[in-house]
Amino acid sequence: MFTAVLMSEKYQNCLPAVQKKNLAVVGAGPAGLAFAINAAARGHQVTLFDAHSEIGGQFNIAKQIPGKEEFYETLRYYRRMIEVTGVTLKLNHTVTADQLQAFDETILASGIVPRTPPIDGIDHPKVLSYLDVLRDKAPVGNKVAIIGCGGIGFD
C-alpha cells in the first residue's frame, strides 16, 4: 500500500516511526541519501546500497561544473549524516533480489539513465554525452555544439 505525505520545505516534522522497520535503500544518489537519513532519523534500521565506490550519484557529476562546487559540501553533509543516523552503507555492492528478501521494505532510488535523442548521426564518434565529458573525461574540441537547453545543457 502506498501512502502519500504532503510536506512543505519550510515545515517538516520528523516524527518517530510508529512501527520500526528494517529498510533497504538501493541507490546512494540524491533521493536515496535523503530517504535513508530521514528514515533512520525516524528510528528505522536502514541499509543503503550502491554499486559505485562513493555516494552521491549525479551530485558527483554536478560538482564538477564551475559554480556548482557547493555539491562537495552537500556530499560532506550526507556522509556525516549517514554516520550520525547509523545508516549502514554498502558501496561497491550490486544488491540482488535474494538479498533484499531479508528486509521489510525496499526503496528503489537507482538514479537516472540519460536520454539519447533520436537524431541522425547521434552515434558518430565525435558526438559526446555530458557523462562522456564530465565523468569519463573524453577530450572535447575547441568548437562545440550543445544539443538541449535544459539544466545540463546550460551548465
Show which residues each predicted segment covers.
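N-terminal Rossmann-like dinucleotide/flavin-binding domain of flavoprotein oxidoreductases
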Residues: 57-101
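Rossmann-like dinucleotide/flavin-binding elements
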Residues: 16-51, 55, 90-98, 102, ...
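Cysteine-cluster motifs in flexible loop/terminal segments that predominantly coordinate metals
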Residues: 1-19
